[in-house]
Amino acid sequence: MQIKATGISSKSSKGKILEVFFPIIDFDGKKTHIKELPNYETSKEIINISWGSEDLKKPISDVISAYLKLHLLSYKFVLPNSINLEGLFDSLPNVVWTNQGAISIDEIDEKLIESKLLNQDLNIRSIDKFPPLTDFIIPENVRIADASRVRLGAYLSPGTTIMHEGFVNFNAGTLGKAMIEGRISSGVVVGNNSDLGGGSSTM
């Protein structure tokens, strides 16, 4: 097995990687829709990764591998609970997720002051290790009423509907058409034609 991926990293002013977006992945012949990056001038670092099947079995040791494994789940190249996610929490930095992108917690106060002085809107959506899925991947034939309630690393099959109070964690999701009004916890999957009622939680 051969896995090749191209990612775009976002960093703090001190050079710390905050997150990595992988729009291009070739998973042993299965590919994402994007085949190459547009020829834009950018100050962001472009990351190229080449993995084998053994890398899926290794614990996570850095931000780059953490984000690649989360992308593999949400692109549905791998099933939940099929790859090693040990070390995920320790590898992911806690990040301020805003309408202007990922910002380091150490720098958010400065950014807030800057936004007020320059009359630029800075909307803080969450402070978390995991970003919303839809900041990175738009799954096909899926409805999500509140995108903040589905994390990157969620596995959503076509025909899935997630209502306003539904929640899907990373390494969790649906294996077919489903109506999700409750919570799907990490490590849990629901089968085809499932209906998870409001207020319910699967663990």
What residue ranges belong to the model's regions?
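Terminal amphipathic alpha-helical/low-complexity segments used for targeting or macromolecular assembly
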Residues: 1-135
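Generic preference for well-ordered secondary structure
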Residues: 50, 54, 128, 132-134, ...
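Right-handed parallel beta-helix
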Residues: 118-158
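A structural motif detector for beta-strand N-caps
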Residues: 142, 148-150, 154-156, 160-162, ...
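Short amphipathic alpha-helical segments, especially helix-boundary/capping motifs
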Residues: 43-47, 122-123, 139-142, 174, ...
